[in-house]
């Protein structure tokens, strides 16, 4: 028997329960070998810090997020902006009042007409200028078309970055149909330069209304199809529901406006709270959410597109023929027959082109409901031909500043739909 025993005196022929096998001690009583305990000691860990953007496609090329991660949980975030800073406010102070419009086009460049209209209303309020009725309706029509374009872009981009490429293509198709109509009216798809102090640049061409209504019918069909693809999509719902939540109280405290505020349950819309142009004559609803998450912010855009379609159709029904710009040649260029045929017309044209309009001295804050929320212009005039001071309240800035609060404690993957749902546009945020 002694020959059969192996190393350590263990009989290899022994089986459990047989003589010589013995009982195995419980695991808890086994003592570690020398140095083995070090393997089980808790290891100190450090949070990982990663850069998301500015070249990351989900950050739209204009924002850098320095994200601190504990595993996949976001522990903190610092935002680095300024990659698209152009000195908007100072640039506007170096040109005439009428030359500011091309700069406003490049704020929220997806819905530029709203920026045109916002600035024009501020100057007209300071100058106490009443614009023609037809110009009011044309401003509303074009603004609401651009609101639809903006929301289509957000919904399409948000779906694409969650893997639904088809929705993005549908959204871009509908947006391009609307942009084609605006290009026919304004001469540009993106940077419209359509509004003027005292009215609009040009009237709608013959047949434009009928073509626009046909395009709206097609856009309605595409929007409904997008809703069918996303509203009950399990992946989309799981990625958006209960992520990026902001309560009504927090949204107000953080300075939210627009769809993001309404998604949190606060029914504030400038078009209802402080009506401008002809919004007080129109029948439309303000959609309001209850959960304040990414899914509610998506639903806000979908419903607002439906309401914008309703507004545009009412404007076409109510709009009557008439002037599209004031006939006060201190603010608007005289018609070409007067310029070419009278000395008064030549002089008025020359002074407006060379010196710009003279806005009475004073200051004013004017605000409108842009696609992302309250767009405000603070304008100061010293009575000269250029703005003395111009300040901008960008609707997207409070939402972007709140992004670290909205994502703290959530998964890294939740950052993408949250960033998309606030619709940060670098042009308006960084100016």
Swiss-Prot record:
What keywords sit in the KW lines?
Cell inner membrane, Cell membrane, Membrane, NAD, Quinone, Translocase, Transport, Ubiquinone
A GO molecular-function annotation: NADH:ubiquinone reductase (non-electrogenic) activity
Under Pfam families, the record lists: Complex1_49kDa (PF00346)
Give the reactions, separated by semicolons, that this protein catalyses.
a quinone + NADH + 5 H(+)(in) = a quinol + NAD(+) + 4 H(+)(out)
Q: What is its EC number?
A: 7.1.1.-
| Enzyme category, top tier | translocase
| A GO cellular component entry from the record | plasma membrane
Q: Where in the cell is it found?
A: Cell inner membrane
Question: Where mainly found?
Answer: membrane
Disordered: annotated segments: 1-37
Q: Which Gene3D superfamilies match?
A: Cytochrome-c3 Hydrogenase, chain B
List the cysteine pairs that form cystine: none
What is the membrane topology here?
Answer: Peripheral membrane protein
Summarizing the function annotation, the protein's role is: NDH-1 shuttles electrons from NADH, via FMN and iron-sulfur (Fe-S) centers, to quinones in the respiratory chain. The immediate electron acceptor for the enzyme in this species is believed to be ubiquinone. Couples the redox reaction to proton translocation (for every two electrons transferred, four hydrogen ions are translocated across the cytoplasmic membrane), and thus conserves the redox energy in a proton gradient.
So what family is this one in? Belongs to the complex I 49 kDa subunit family.
Quaternary data: NDH-1 is composed of 14 different subunits. Subunits NuoB, C, D, E, F, and G constitute the peripheral sector of the complex.
Task: Please identify the protein, giving its name as recorded.
Answer: NADH-quinone oxidoreductase subunit D 2
What species is given as this protein's source?
A: Anaeromyxobacter sp. (strain K)
């Amino acid at each position: 028997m002694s020959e059969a025993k192996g190393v350590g005196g263990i009989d290899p022929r022994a089986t459990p329960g047989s003589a010589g096998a013995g009982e195995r001690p419980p695991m808890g009583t086994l003592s570690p070998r020398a140095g083995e305990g070090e393997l089980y000691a808790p290891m100190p860990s450090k949070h990982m810090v990663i850069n998301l953007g500015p070249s990351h496609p989900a950050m739209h090329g204009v924002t850098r997020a320095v994200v601190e991660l504990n595993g996949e949980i976001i522990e903190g975030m610092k935002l680095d902006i300024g990659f698209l800073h152009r000195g908007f406010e100072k640039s506007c102070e170096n040109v005439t009042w009428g030359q500011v419009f091309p700069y406003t086009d490049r704020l929220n460049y997806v819905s530029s007409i709203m920026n045109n209209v916002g600035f024009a209303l501020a100057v007209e309020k300071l100058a106490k200028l009443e614009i023609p009725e037809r110009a009011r309706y044309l401003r509303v029509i074009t603004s609401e078309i651009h609101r639809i374009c903006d929301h289509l872009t957000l919904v399409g981009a948000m779906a694409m970055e969650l893997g639904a490429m088809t929705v993005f293509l549908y959204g871009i198709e509908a947006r391009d149909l609307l942009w084609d109509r605006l290009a026919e009216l304004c001469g540009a798809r993106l940077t419209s330069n359509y509004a003027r102090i005292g009215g609009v640049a040009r009237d709608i061409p013959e047949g434009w209304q009928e073509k626009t209504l046909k395009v709206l019918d097609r856009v309605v069909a595409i929007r409904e199809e997008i809703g069918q693809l996303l509203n009950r999509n399990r992946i989309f719902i799981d990625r958006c529901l209960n992520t990026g939540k902001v309560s009504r109280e927090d949204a107000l405290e953080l300075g939210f406006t627009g769809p993001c505020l309404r998604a949190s349950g606060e029914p504030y819309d400038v078009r209802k709270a402080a009506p401008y142009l002809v919004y007080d004559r129109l029948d439309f609803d303000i959609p309001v959410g209850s959960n304040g998450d990414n899914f509610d912010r998506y639903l806000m855009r979908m419903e607002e597109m439906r309401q914008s379609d309703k507004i545009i159709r009412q404007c076409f029904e109510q709009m009557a023929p008439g002037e599209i710009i004031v006939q006060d040649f201190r603010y608007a260029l005289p018609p070409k027959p007067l310029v070419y045929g009278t000395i008064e017309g030549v002089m008025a044209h020359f002074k407006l082109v060379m010196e710009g309009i003279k806005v009475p001295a004073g200051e004013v804050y004017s605000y409108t409901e842009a696609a992302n929320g309250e767009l405000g212009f603070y304008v100061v005039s010293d009575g000269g031909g250029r703005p003395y001071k111009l300040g901008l309240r960008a609707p997207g800035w409070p939402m972007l500043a709140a992004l670290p609060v909205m994502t703290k404690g959530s998964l890294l993957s939740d950052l993408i739909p949250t960033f998309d749902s606030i619709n940060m546009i670098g042009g308006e945020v960084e100016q």
